[in-house]
Amino acid sequence: MKLLLFTALVLVVISLIEVEAENERACIPLEKECTKTPGNCCSGLKCDCYRRFEQGVAKGIQCWCIEEDVTYKGV
């Protein structure tokens, strides 16, 4: 019984450490790439993605942290 309680306590402590580490990770600033971590832009920013084309051929998707209330238009 003691072993079961000890194991449960260890699992709870490990879970809390992981959550705290996730909350402390650095956010991605304005106009930096967020393709691999779309939910990690700093406060007031959103991760917006675009499909990239080179000479009419799709070359993948790239995402950038941009301001939430700003809309960008192609030139």
Swiss-Prot record:
It comes from the Eukaryota. GO terms for cellular component: extracellular region. Residues 1-21 form the signal peptide. GO terms for molecular function: toxin activity. Keywords: Disulfide bond, Secreted, Signal, Toxin. This is U6-lycotoxin-Ls1a. It is found in: Secreted. It comes from Lycosa singoriensis.
